[in-house]
């Protein structure tokens, strides 16, 4: 299992969206060379993963593991959008649980995540929450330490 890296506590899903789009673009590149074993071997070495993993990713046109999005998800529309980009699920936190309408908002996110491919249900889920009660969150530009900057750099 992996997760995309959004910025938790911000209510800004843009970082999670950016990461899943980057991941999808990289998978498309691998998919485009799926018939060239030498290129797949080169990519496997470059990424420091097994040839079998690169080959399977190319064949599936997705990572061969579950991919969850996290960070900044605070509305049903956020969750549905990430699912439509290819995520297998979403993790929610303070964007939901610190909102004034947390129970209603959590139910709406579950509904939108389950039926992300049905716009009518996603719209109904979005109508279940009052955006005036959304957690305003933090400005990602002013964070001292961003999630994507933690840990050792590779």
What are the roles of these predicted feature ranges?
Residues 11-26, 98-121, 133-137:
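C-terminal helical cap(s) of enzyme catalytic domains, especially alpha/beta-barrels
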Residues 15-18, 29-32, 36, 83-85, ...:
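Generic preference for flexible, low-structure residues
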Residues 23, 69, 82, 87, ...:
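Generic hydrophobic/packing signal
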Residues 12-21, 61, 68, 72-82, ...:
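Contiguous hydrophobic segments
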Residues 1-66:
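Conserved anion-binding
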Residues 41-96, 148:
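Active-site/ligand-binding-proximal alpha/beta "capping" segment
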Residues 28-47, 113-154:
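Extended, intrinsically disordered, low-complexity segments
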Residues 1-13, 72, 85-106, 154:
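Glycine-rich phosphate-binding active-site loops on the catalytic face of alpha/beta enzymes
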